[in-house]
Amino acid sequence: MKLTEQQQQTLRAAVDRIIPPDDYPGAWESGVVDYLTRQFERDLRPAFADYCNGLTALNAESLARFQQNFSQLSEWNQDHVLRLVETGEVITTWEVAPHSFFDLLVRTTAEGFYSDPEQGGNRNSVSWSMVGFE
């Protein structure tokens, strides 16, 4: 199970808007996509098609609204598109309910960010350090 290059770029940008870098690394740098890639072969296998369809639709929504791929949008516009997806205010056709995809994306991003580093995310235990868990 593998994402297309476009889906990977969209995923990378989306997870970094859900958990953006600040004084600590964001979701991408913390290994969330590594976690998700591993989980697509395991627990997320049943949701893989929804993930792929959602990422493709998220990018299509960005193209329809801004004539740019999601990964190329400004952070403000990425946040705007994600808010519209969260509330279901989309103008393109989605094969998965937009709000359901948003919920899946947020939940699995948080899982990867706060998971045990042995699961592929939370690189260098960054999120645990952030919350004071040693």
Mark where each language-model region is.
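Aromatic-lined, polymer-binding surfaces characteristic
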Residues: 25
